[in-house]
Amino acid sequence: MSAKTLYEKLVESHTIRELDNEGHVLLYIDRSILNEYTSPQAFSGLRERGRAVRHPDTFLLNIDHVNPTRSQRDVLMTDPGGQLQVDYFRENAADFGITLFDVLDPRQGIEHVVAHEQGLVMPGMVIAAGDSHTTTYGAFGALGFGIGTSEIEHLLATQTLVYRKLKTMRVSVQGELPFACSAKDIVLELLERIGADGATGYAIEFVGEAISALSVEGRMTLCNMAVEAGARGAIIAPDKKVFDYIYGKPQMPVGELWQQALLEWSQLSSDADAVFDKTVAINCHDLEPKVTWGISPDQTGSITGRVPFPEQETNPLKRLALEKALHYMGLTAGMLLKDIRISHAFIGSCTNGRIEDLRAVAKVLEGRKIASHVRGIIVPGSTMVRRQAEEEGLAKIFIAAGFEWRQSGCSMCLAMNEDVLSPGDRCASGTNRNFLGRQGAGARTHLMSPAMVAAAAVAGHLVDVRSLLQAGE
Protein backbone atom coordinates (compact mmCIF):
# COMPACT_ATOMS: atom_id res chain seq x y z
CA MET A 1 0.00 0.00 0.00
CA SER A 2 1.46 3.37 -1.03
CA ALA A 3 2.00 6.10 1.56
CA LYS A 4 -0.72 8.75 1.71
CA THR A 5 -1.13 12.29 2.94
CA LEU A 6 -3.85 13.12 5.46
CA TYR A 7 -5.78 14.91 2.73
CA GLU A 8 -5.67 11.84 0.52
CA LYS A 9 -6.85 9.64 3.38
CA LEU A 10 -9.83 11.89 4.12
CA VAL A 11 -10.90 12.04 0.49
CA GLU A 12 -10.45 8.30 0.02
CA SER A 13 -12.50 7.48 3.14
CA HIS A 14 -15.38 9.64 1.86
CA THR A 15 -15.30 8.61 -1.81
CA ILE A 16 -18.43 6.73 -2.86
CA ARG A 17 -17.10 6.04 -6.34
CA GLU A 18 -14.69 7.31 -8.97
CA LEU A 19 -16.44 9.21 -11.76
CA ASP A 20 -13.69 9.42 -14.40
CA ASN A 21 -9.96 9.23 -14.97
CA GLU A 22 -9.44 12.94 -14.31
CA GLY A 23 -9.77 12.86 -10.54
CA HIS A 24 -13.50 13.45 -10.20
CA VAL A 25 -15.24 11.45 -7.47
CA LEU A 26 -18.64 11.35 -5.81
CA LEU A 27 -17.83 12.51 -2.29
CA TYR A 28 -19.90 11.95 0.85
CA ILE A 29 -20.22 15.08 3.01
CA ASP A 30 -20.55 14.74 6.78
CA ARG A 31 -21.72 18.22 7.68
CA SER A 32 -22.72 21.58 6.26
CA ILE A 33 -23.40 25.00 7.74
CA LEU A 34 -25.39 27.38 5.55
CA ASN A 35 -25.94 31.13 5.79
CA GLU A 36 -28.73 33.39 4.63
CA TYR A 37 -26.72 34.90 1.78
CA THR A 38 -25.55 31.96 -0.35
CA SER A 39 -28.35 29.42 0.16
CA PRO A 40 -31.71 30.94 -0.97
CA GLN A 41 -31.48 29.83 -4.62
CA ALA A 42 -30.50 26.32 -3.51
CA PHE A 43 -33.68 25.95 -1.49
CA SER A 44 -35.69 27.44 -4.36
CA GLY A 45 -34.25 24.72 -6.59
CA LEU A 46 -35.41 22.03 -4.16
CA ARG A 47 -38.90 23.51 -4.08
CA GLU A 48 -39.14 23.74 -7.88
CA ARG A 49 -38.15 20.09 -8.26
CA GLY A 50 -40.17 18.82 -5.30
CA ARG A 51 -37.12 17.45 -3.51
CA ALA A 52 -36.58 16.99 0.21
CA VAL A 53 -33.38 17.49 2.19
CA ARG A 54 -31.83 14.04 2.48
CA HIS A 55 -30.35 14.39 5.98
CA PRO A 56 -31.59 17.59 7.68
CA ASP A 57 -29.77 16.71 10.90
CA THR A 58 -26.38 17.13 9.20
CA PHE A 59 -27.11 20.78 8.32
CA LEU A 60 -27.19 23.94 10.40
CA LEU A 61 -28.68 27.21 9.19
CA ASN A 62 -27.15 30.31 10.74
CA ILE A 63 -27.81 34.02 10.21
CA ASP A 64 -24.59 36.04 10.16
CA HIS A 65 -23.91 37.96 6.94
CA VAL A 66 -26.65 40.62 6.79
CA ASN A 67 -27.74 41.03 10.41
CA PRO A 68 -27.04 44.31 12.22
CA THR A 69 -24.50 44.14 15.05
CA ARG A 70 -25.58 47.22 16.99
CA SER A 71 -25.80 46.65 20.74
CA GLN A 72 -29.59 46.35 20.82
CA ARG A 73 -30.50 43.09 19.09
CA ASP A 74 -33.48 43.05 16.70
CA VAL A 75 -34.92 40.32 14.49
CA LEU A 76 -35.55 42.94 11.80
CA MET A 77 -32.91 43.81 9.20
CA THR A 78 -32.34 47.44 8.26
CA ASP A 79 -31.98 46.58 4.56
CA PRO A 80 -35.16 45.42 2.76
CA GLY A 81 -33.17 42.96 0.65
CA GLY A 82 -31.54 41.55 3.74
CA GLN A 83 -34.94 41.20 5.37
CA LEU A 84 -36.21 39.18 2.41
CA GLN A 85 -33.19 36.89 2.63
CA VAL A 86 -33.66 36.32 6.34
CA ASP A 87 -37.42 35.77 6.07
CA TYR A 88 -36.92 33.18 3.32
CA PHE A 89 -34.13 31.55 5.34
CA ARG A 90 -36.46 31.17 8.31
CA GLU A 91 -39.14 29.73 6.05
CA ASN A 92 -36.68 27.21 4.61
CA ALA A 93 -35.56 26.11 8.06
CA ALA A 94 -39.15 25.47 9.11
CA ASP A 95 -40.27 23.79 5.88
CA PHE A 96 -37.26 21.49 5.52
CA GLY A 97 -36.82 20.67 9.21
CA ILE A 98 -33.32 22.13 9.65
CA THR A 99 -32.07 23.71 12.86
CA LEU A 100 -31.74 27.50 12.62
CA PHE A 101 -29.64 29.79 14.80
CA ASP A 102 -31.66 32.98 14.41
CA VAL A 103 -30.46 36.44 15.43
CA LEU A 104 -31.77 36.22 19.00
CA ASP A 105 -30.61 32.64 19.54
CA PRO A 106 -27.96 32.54 22.31
CA ARG A 107 -25.90 30.24 20.05
CA GLN A 108 -25.90 32.61 17.06
CA GLY A 109 -22.70 33.94 15.57
CA ILE A 110 -20.48 33.71 12.51
CA GLU A 111 -20.88 30.25 11.00
CA HIS A 112 -17.18 29.33 11.25
CA VAL A 113 -17.17 30.24 14.94
CA VAL A 114 -20.52 28.70 15.83
CA ALA A 115 -19.78 25.35 14.20
CA HIS A 116 -16.86 24.46 16.43
CA GLU A 117 -18.51 25.93 19.53
CA GLN A 118 -21.37 23.49 19.08
CA GLY A 119 -19.08 20.52 18.45
CA LEU A 120 -20.28 20.13 14.88
CA VAL A 121 -16.71 19.86 13.58
CA MET A 122 -14.89 16.63 14.37
CA PRO A 123 -11.52 15.28 13.22
CA GLY A 124 -11.75 13.19 10.08
CA MET A 125 -14.92 14.85 8.79
CA VAL A 126 -15.46 16.31 5.34
CA ILE A 127 -17.44 19.54 5.56
CA ALA A 128 -18.75 21.69 2.72
CA ALA A 129 -20.49 25.05 3.10
CA GLY A 130 -21.50 28.02 1.01
CA ASP A 131 -18.60 30.15 2.17
CA SER A 132 -14.99 30.07 1.01
CA HIS A 133 -13.58 30.22 4.53
CA THR A 134 -14.90 26.75 5.32
CA THR A 135 -11.19 25.84 5.16
CA THR A 136 -11.17 26.97 8.83
CA TYR A 137 -12.19 23.47 9.91
CA GLY A 138 -8.85 22.04 8.87
CA ALA A 139 -7.60 23.18 12.28
CA PHE A 140 -9.45 20.15 13.70
CA GLY A 141 -8.06 17.62 11.26
CA ALA A 142 -11.14 17.89 9.05
CA LEU A 143 -11.37 18.76 5.37
CA GLY A 144 -13.48 21.85 4.80
CA PHE A 145 -14.12 23.69 1.56
CA GLY A 146 -16.52 26.23 0.12
CA ILE A 147 -19.11 25.47 -2.55
CA GLY A 148 -21.43 27.42 -4.84
CA THR A 149 -25.20 27.67 -4.77
CA SER A 150 -25.87 24.90 -7.32
CA GLU A 151 -23.59 22.60 -5.32
CA ILE A 152 -25.48 23.50 -2.14
CA GLU A 153 -28.70 22.33 -3.80
CA HIS A 154 -27.05 19.06 -4.84
CA LEU A 155 -25.69 18.57 -1.32
CA LEU A 156 -29.05 19.25 0.33
CA ALA A 157 -30.75 16.71 -1.92
CA THR A 158 -28.13 13.93 -1.94
CA GLN A 159 -25.62 14.46 0.90
CA THR A 160 -22.93 14.18 -1.79
CA LEU A 161 -20.91 16.36 -4.14
CA VAL A 162 -19.05 15.84 -7.38
CA TYR A 163 -15.52 16.67 -6.29
CA ARG A 164 -12.23 16.96 -8.12
CA LYS A 165 -9.26 15.76 -6.13
CA LEU A 166 -6.55 18.32 -5.42
CA LYS A 167 -2.79 18.25 -5.50
CA THR A 168 -1.07 18.41 -2.11
CA MET A 169 1.17 21.08 -0.62
CA ARG A 170 3.18 20.72 2.57
CA VAL A 171 3.85 24.00 4.39
CA SER A 172 6.47 23.47 7.08
CA VAL A 173 6.69 26.26 9.66
CA GLN A 174 9.69 25.86 11.94
CA GLY A 175 11.15 27.85 14.81
CA GLU A 176 9.62 29.65 17.75
CA LEU A 177 7.05 32.33 16.99
CA PRO A 178 8.66 35.67 17.94
CA PHE A 179 7.26 38.01 20.57
CA ALA A 180 4.00 39.75 19.53
CA CYS A 181 3.66 37.63 16.37
CA SER A 182 0.70 35.34 15.78
CA ALA A 183 -0.88 32.89 13.38
CA LYS A 184 -2.10 35.86 11.33
CA ASP A 185 1.51 36.87 10.72
CA ILE A 186 2.42 33.34 9.64
CA VAL A 187 -0.34 33.17 7.06
CA LEU A 188 0.38 36.68 5.75
CA GLU A 189 4.03 35.67 5.39
CA LEU A 190 2.94 32.60 3.43
CA LEU A 191 0.74 34.73 1.18
CA GLU A 192 3.55 37.20 0.54
CA ARG A 193 5.82 34.32 -0.49
CA ILE A 194 3.59 32.21 -2.73
CA GLY A 195 1.05 34.79 -3.89
CA ALA A 196 -2.73 34.84 -4.10
CA ASP A 197 -2.73 31.95 -6.57
CA GLY A 198 0.23 30.02 -5.18
CA ALA A 199 -1.95 27.23 -3.79
CA THR A 200 -4.63 27.14 -6.48
CA GLY A 201 -5.51 23.52 -7.13
CA TYR A 202 -3.89 22.37 -3.89
CA ALA A 203 -4.85 21.24 -0.42
CA ILE A 204 -2.34 22.53 2.13
CA GLU A 205 -1.15 20.58 5.14
CA PHE A 206 0.55 22.74 7.78
CA VAL A 207 3.29 21.03 9.80
CA GLY A 208 6.24 21.98 11.97
CA GLU A 209 7.10 23.00 15.51
CA ALA A 210 5.56 26.47 15.11
CA ILE A 211 2.27 24.89 14.08
CA SER A 212 2.32 22.44 16.98
CA ALA A 213 2.91 25.35 19.35
CA LEU A 214 -0.12 27.28 18.07
CA SER A 215 -3.36 27.15 20.01
CA VAL A 216 -6.36 25.61 18.28
CA GLU A 217 -7.79 29.08 17.70
CA GLY A 218 -4.52 30.18 16.12
CA ARG A 219 -4.68 27.16 13.84
CA MET A 220 -8.18 28.20 12.82
CA THR A 221 -6.85 31.59 11.72
CA LEU A 222 -4.17 29.87 9.67
CA CYS A 223 -6.53 27.45 7.92
CA ASN A 224 -9.15 30.17 7.47
CA MET A 225 -6.85 32.31 5.34
CA ALA A 226 -5.24 29.49 3.36
CA VAL A 227 -8.00 30.03 0.83
CA GLU A 228 -6.52 33.49 0.14
CA ALA A 229 -3.62 31.66 -1.53
CA GLY A 230 -6.11 29.74 -3.66
CA ALA A 231 -6.13 26.57 -1.54
CA ARG A 232 -9.42 24.66 -1.50
CA GLY A 233 -8.47 22.89 1.68
CA ALA A 234 -6.07 23.33 4.58
CA ILE A 235 -5.41 20.67 7.20
CA ILE A 236 -3.47 20.27 10.42
CA ALA A 237 -3.24 16.78 11.91
CA PRO A 238 -5.25 16.71 15.16
CA ASP A 239 -3.40 16.35 18.46
CA LYS A 240 -4.08 16.53 22.20
CA LYS A 241 -4.69 20.28 21.98
CA VAL A 242 -7.53 19.64 19.57
CA PHE A 243 -8.98 16.78 21.58
CA ASP A 244 -8.93 18.85 24.78
CA TYR A 245 -10.49 21.82 22.96
CA ILE A 246 -13.46 19.90 21.56
CA TYR A 247 -14.09 17.71 24.61
CA GLY A 248 -17.50 18.30 26.18
CA LYS A 249 -18.91 20.47 23.40
CA PRO A 250 -22.64 19.93 22.77
CA GLN A 251 -22.52 17.60 19.75
CA MET A 252 -19.41 15.65 20.75
CA PRO A 253 -19.64 11.93 21.63
CA VAL A 254 -19.52 11.05 25.32
CA GLY A 255 -18.44 8.12 27.45
CA GLU A 256 -17.31 5.03 25.57
CA LEU A 257 -18.12 6.65 22.23
CA TRP A 258 -15.68 9.47 23.07
CA GLN A 259 -12.94 6.96 23.85
CA GLN A 260 -13.58 5.12 20.60
CA ALA A 261 -13.50 8.39 18.69
CA LEU A 262 -10.19 9.36 20.30
CA LEU A 263 -8.63 6.11 19.14
CA GLU A 264 -9.73 6.79 15.57
CA TRP A 265 -8.82 10.48 15.60
CA SER A 266 -5.34 9.78 16.97
CA GLN A 267 -4.57 7.89 13.75
CA LEU A 268 -5.30 10.90 11.54
CA SER A 269 -1.96 11.98 10.09
CA SER A 270 0.04 11.79 6.91
CA ASP A 271 2.26 8.77 6.52
CA ALA A 272 5.90 9.52 7.30
CA ASP A 273 6.96 8.75 3.73
CA ALA A 274 3.99 10.39 2.02
CA VAL A 275 4.95 12.45 -1.02
CA PHE A 276 3.56 15.96 -1.49
CA ASP A 277 3.32 17.65 -4.87
CA LYS A 278 4.83 20.85 -3.52
CA THR A 279 6.66 21.90 -0.36
CA VAL A 280 7.09 25.35 1.20
CA ALA A 281 9.31 26.05 4.20
CA ILE A 282 9.01 29.02 6.56
CA ASN A 283 11.32 29.77 9.48
CA CYS A 284 9.72 31.98 12.11
CA HIS A 285 13.04 33.26 13.45
CA ASP A 286 12.94 36.55 11.51
CA LEU A 287 9.15 36.92 11.36
CA GLU A 288 7.78 40.35 12.27
CA PRO A 289 4.22 41.65 12.64
CA LYS A 290 2.72 41.92 9.16
CA VAL A 291 0.33 44.36 7.48
CA THR A 292 -1.12 44.52 4.00
CA TRP A 293 -0.61 47.63 1.90
CA GLY A 294 -2.51 46.68 -1.25
CA ILE A 295 -5.77 45.26 -2.54
CA SER A 296 -4.97 41.55 -2.23
CA PRO A 297 -3.98 39.66 0.93
CA ASP A 298 -0.63 38.73 -0.63
CA GLN A 299 0.29 42.40 -1.04
CA THR A 300 1.78 42.51 2.40
CA GLY A 301 4.97 43.31 4.28
CA SER A 302 6.50 43.63 7.72
CA ILE A 303 5.42 46.67 9.73
CA THR A 304 9.06 47.83 9.74
CA GLY A 305 9.06 47.95 5.93
CA ARG A 306 7.98 50.36 3.21
CA VAL A 307 5.40 50.53 0.45
CA PRO A 308 7.06 48.91 -2.60
CA PHE A 309 8.23 50.71 -5.75
CA PRO A 310 6.33 49.44 -8.82
CA GLU A 311 9.21 50.37 -11.14
CA GLN A 312 11.39 47.79 -9.40
CA GLU A 313 9.06 45.01 -10.55
CA THR A 314 10.35 43.44 -13.78
CA ASN A 315 7.13 41.58 -14.62
CA PRO A 316 4.90 44.10 -16.46
CA LEU A 317 1.65 42.52 -15.25
CA LYS A 318 2.81 42.53 -11.63
CA ARG A 319 4.05 46.11 -12.02
CA LEU A 320 0.63 47.14 -13.32
CA ALA A 321 -1.01 45.38 -10.35
CA LEU A 322 1.24 47.29 -7.95
CA GLU A 323 0.41 50.60 -9.59
CA LYS A 324 -3.30 49.82 -9.43
CA ALA A 325 -3.05 48.89 -5.75
CA LEU A 326 -1.14 52.02 -4.75
CA HIS A 327 -3.55 54.23 -6.69
CA TYR A 328 -6.61 52.72 -5.02
CA MET A 329 -5.01 52.72 -1.58
CA GLY A 330 -3.81 56.32 -1.92
CA LEU A 331 -0.24 55.40 -0.99
CA THR A 332 3.14 56.63 -2.19
CA ALA A 333 5.86 54.17 -3.11
CA GLY A 334 8.63 54.11 -0.53
CA MET A 335 6.62 55.49 2.38
CA LEU A 336 6.99 53.75 5.72
CA LEU A 337 4.09 51.43 6.49
CA LYS A 338 4.03 52.72 10.05
CA ASP A 339 3.32 56.24 8.75
CA ILE A 340 -0.04 55.26 7.23
CA ARG A 341 -2.82 57.10 9.07
CA ILE A 342 -6.11 55.29 9.69
CA SER A 343 -9.68 56.44 10.31
CA HIS A 344 -11.18 53.14 11.48
CA ALA A 345 -10.17 50.01 13.37
CA PHE A 346 -12.18 46.81 13.11
CA ILE A 347 -11.73 43.61 15.10
CA GLY A 348 -13.87 40.54 14.43
CA SER A 349 -14.74 38.07 11.64
CA CYS A 350 -14.36 34.31 11.26
CA THR A 351 -10.61 34.90 11.07
CA ASN A 352 -10.02 36.77 14.31
CA GLY A 353 -13.25 37.10 16.31
CA ARG A 354 -12.64 34.42 18.94
CA ILE A 355 -11.98 34.81 22.65
CA GLU A 356 -8.21 34.36 22.29
CA ASP A 357 -8.15 37.23 19.78
CA LEU A 358 -10.11 39.47 22.13
CA ARG A 359 -7.74 38.70 25.00
CA ALA A 360 -4.82 39.79 22.84
CA VAL A 361 -6.65 43.02 22.04
CA ALA A 362 -7.39 43.70 25.71
CA LYS A 363 -3.72 43.30 26.56
CA VAL A 364 -2.89 46.14 24.17
CA LEU A 365 -5.81 48.39 25.10
CA GLU A 366 -5.79 48.11 28.88
CA GLY A 367 -5.13 51.54 30.37
CA ARG A 368 -5.05 53.20 26.94
CA LYS A 369 -7.40 55.25 24.75
CA ILE A 370 -7.79 55.06 21.01
CA ALA A 371 -6.88 58.15 18.97
CA SER A 372 -9.61 60.79 18.84
CA HIS A 373 -9.94 60.61 15.04
CA VAL A 374 -10.32 56.81 14.97
CA ARG A 375 -13.62 54.96 15.14
CA GLY A 376 -13.03 51.55 16.67
CA ILE A 377 -15.48 48.64 16.43
CA ILE A 378 -15.16 45.20 18.02
CA VAL A 379 -17.61 42.51 16.93
CA PRO A 380 -17.31 39.15 18.71
CA GLY A 381 -17.46 36.06 16.53
CA SER A 382 -20.48 34.68 18.37
CA THR A 383 -22.91 35.42 21.15
CA MET A 384 -21.05 32.88 23.28
CA VAL A 385 -17.75 34.70 22.68
CA ARG A 386 -19.45 37.97 23.60
CA ARG A 387 -20.72 36.53 26.89
CA GLN A 388 -17.32 35.10 27.75
CA ALA A 389 -15.57 38.39 26.97
CA GLU A 390 -17.98 40.19 29.27
CA GLU A 391 -17.52 37.62 32.03
CA GLU A 392 -13.73 38.03 31.79
CA GLY A 393 -13.98 41.82 31.96
CA LEU A 394 -12.61 42.32 28.45
CA ALA A 395 -15.62 44.28 27.23
CA LYS A 396 -15.06 46.91 29.94
CA ILE A 397 -11.50 47.39 28.71
CA PHE A 398 -12.70 47.81 25.12
CA ILE A 399 -15.36 50.34 26.04
CA ALA A 400 -13.03 52.29 28.34
CA ALA A 401 -10.52 52.52 25.49
CA GLY A 402 -13.16 54.02 23.20
CA PHE A 403 -14.16 51.01 21.09
CA GLU A 404 -17.78 50.21 20.25
CA TRP A 405 -18.70 46.79 21.68
CA ARG A 406 -21.14 45.07 19.34
CA GLN A 407 -23.26 41.95 18.93
CA SER A 408 -22.02 39.05 16.81
CA GLY A 409 -22.07 38.84 13.03
CA CYS A 410 -19.88 39.21 9.95
CA SER A 411 -20.22 42.97 10.26
CA MET A 412 -17.51 45.10 8.65
CA CYS A 413 -15.65 42.15 7.16
CA LEU A 414 -17.76 42.71 4.06
CA ALA A 415 -20.06 45.50 2.90
CA MET A 416 -23.24 43.45 3.16
CA ASN A 417 -24.90 44.96 6.21
CA GLU A 418 -25.10 48.34 7.88
CA ASP A 419 -21.45 48.28 9.04
CA VAL A 420 -19.99 49.84 5.89
CA LEU A 421 -17.09 52.25 5.41
CA SER A 422 -17.36 55.38 3.28
CA PRO A 423 -15.17 56.23 0.27
CA GLY A 424 -11.70 57.26 1.43
CA ASP A 425 -12.00 55.68 4.87
CA ARG A 426 -8.92 53.70 5.85
CA CYS A 427 -9.34 50.75 8.20
CA ALA A 428 -6.90 48.65 10.19
CA SER A 429 -8.76 45.35 10.08
CA GLY A 430 -8.43 41.93 11.69
CA THR A 431 -10.29 40.30 8.81
CA ASN A 432 -9.28 38.15 5.83
CA ARG A 433 -9.76 40.18 2.65
CA ASN A 434 -8.69 43.64 1.50
CA PHE A 435 -10.20 43.55 -1.99
CA LEU A 436 -11.44 46.64 -3.80
CA GLY A 437 -14.56 47.83 -1.96
CA ARG A 438 -14.58 44.86 0.42
CA GLN A 439 -15.56 47.04 3.39
CA GLY A 440 -17.40 49.64 1.34
CA ALA A 441 -17.08 51.37 -2.03
CA GLY A 442 -13.83 53.32 -2.12
CA ALA A 443 -12.81 52.14 1.35
CA ARG A 444 -9.20 51.10 2.02
CA THR A 445 -8.40 48.03 4.12
CA HIS A 446 -5.16 46.99 5.81
CA LEU A 447 -5.15 43.43 7.16
CA MET A 448 -3.22 42.56 10.33
CA SER A 449 -3.52 40.67 13.60
CA PRO A 450 -6.07 41.81 16.22
CA ALA A 451 -3.28 43.07 18.49
CA MET A 452 -1.86 45.12 15.62
CA VAL A 453 -5.32 46.58 14.95
CA ALA A 454 -5.62 47.61 18.60
CA ALA A 455 -2.18 49.21 18.50
CA ALA A 456 -3.05 51.13 15.32
CA ALA A 457 -6.26 52.38 16.91
CA VAL A 458 -4.30 53.76 19.87
CA ALA A 459 -1.59 55.35 17.71
CA GLY A 460 -3.96 56.63 15.03
CA HIS A 461 -1.77 55.07 12.35
CA LEU A 462 -0.24 51.70 11.54
CA VAL A 463 2.31 50.91 14.22
CA ASP A 464 4.45 48.06 15.49
CA VAL A 465 2.53 46.50 18.38
CA ARG A 466 5.85 45.55 19.95
CA SER A 467 6.36 49.21 20.79
CA LEU A 468 3.26 49.11 23.01
CA LEU A 469 3.99 45.83 24.74
CA GLN A 470 6.80 44.74 26.98
CA ALA A 471 8.70 41.59 26.05
CA GLY A 472 7.43 38.62 27.99
CA GLU A 473 3.80 39.75 28.23
From Swiss-Prot:
Binds 1 [4Fe-4S] cluster per subunit. It catalyses: (2R,3S)-3-isopropylmalate = (2S)-2-isopropylmalate. Its EC number is 4.2.1.33. Its cofactor is [4Fe-4S] cluster. One of its GO terms (biological process) is L-leucine biosynthetic process. Transmembrane segments: none annotated. Keywords: 4Fe-4S, Amino-acid biosynthesis, Branched-chain amino acid biosynthesis, Iron, Iron-sulfur, Leucine biosynthesis, Lyase, Metal-binding. PROSITE patterns: ACONITASE_1, ACONITASE_2. Pathway: Amino-acid biosynthesis; L-leucine biosynthesis; L-leucine from 3-methyl-2-oxobutanoate: step 2/4. It is an enzyme of class 4 (lyase). [4Fe-4S] cluster binds at residues 350, 410, 413. One of its GO terms (molecular function) is metal ion binding. Pfam families: Aconitase. Heterodimer of LeuC and LeuD. PANTHER family: 3-ISOPROPYLMALATE DEHYDRATASE, HOMOACONITASE, MITOCHONDRIAL-RELATED. Belongs to the aconitase/IPM isomerase family. LeuC type 1 subfamily. Catalyzes the isomerization between 2-isopropylmalate and 3-isopropylmalate, via the formation of 2-isopropylmaleate. This is 3-isopropylmalate dehydratase large subunit 2.
